[in-house]
Amino acid sequence: VVYKARDRVTNETIALKKIRLEQEDEGVPSTAIREISLLKEMQHRNIVRLQDVVHSEKRLYLVFEYLDLDLKKHMDSSPEFVKDPRQVKMFLYQMLCGIAYCHSHRVLHRDLKPQNLLIDRRTNCVKLADFGLARAFGIPVRTFTHEV
């Protein structure tokens, strides 16, 4: 669950992604560990910025920059958007820049969809978000068969 919040120190609007730690024996979910470890290494204008990680009793909060619009909401509320090839190309270019940056850092997002592409309304900047299913890739440890 993601909440809109205000940083008490900077007065900046932020997004808080709450992760429940209900099972004491299981610890932090692997999706949260992956998202944190990958995002703290990546800094790019087309990737959502992870600002902090806060641990409190039975909860983990990921603190992100706040962006209130995703591509799905944008397309639903602005049907003329898909008819404007210049704007579509601009958004697609930014998305590809973010993906290229991920790949250059050996990260596969694995959950690209309009809801995971956030838009900064002030700058029209598109940012990849939700790296919970993302994976780092490298040389495979074991060889896989070519047969299914």
From Swiss-Prot:
Q: How activity is regulated?
A: Phosphorylation inactivates the enzyme; while. Thr-145 phosphorylation is required for the catalytic activity of the enzyme.
Which InterPro entries does the protein's record reference?
CDK, Kinase-like_dom_sf, Prot_kinase_dom, Ser/Thr_kinase_AS
Record EC number: 2.7.11.22, 2.7.11.23
Which residues catalyse the reaction?
Answer: 111
Is RNA-binding among this UniProt entry's keywords? no
- Tell me which Gene Ontology terms the entry assigns under biological process: cell division; G1/S transition of mitotic cell cycle; regulation of G2/M transition of mitotic cell cycle; regulation of meiotic cell cycle; signal transduction
Which residues, renumbered to this chain, carry the PTM Phosphothreonine?
A: 145
**Residue ranges annotated for the Protein kinase domain, each copy included:** 1-148
Recorded GO cellular component terms are: cyclin-dependent protein kinase holoenzyme complex; cytoplasm; nucleus
- Write down the PROSITE patterns for this protein, in alphabetical order: PROTEIN_KINASE_DOM (PS50011), PROTEIN_KINASE_ST (PS00108)
Top-level enzyme category: transferase
List the catalytic activities from the record. L-seryl-[protein] + ATP = O-phospho-L-seryl-[protein] + ADP + H(+); L-threonyl-[protein] + ATP = O-phospho-L-threonyl-[protein] + ADP + H(+); [DNA-directed RNA polymerase] + ATP = phospho-[DNA-directed RNA polymerase] + ADP + H(+)
Which GO terms label this protein's molecular function in UniProt? ATP binding; cyclin binding; cyclin-dependent protein serine/threonine kinase activity; protein serine kinase activity; RNA polymerase II CTD heptapeptide repeat kinase activity
Q: Which domain of life is it from?
A: Eukaryota
Functional description taken from the UniProt entry = Plays a key role in the control of the eukaryotic cell cycle. It is required in higher cells for entry into S-phase and mitosis. Component of the kinase complex that phosphorylates the repetitive C-terminus of RNA polymerase II.
> What is the protein's name according to its record?
Cell division control protein 2 homolog 1
Query: Where does this protein come from, organism-wise?
Result: Pisum sativum
Protein encoded by which gene: CDC2
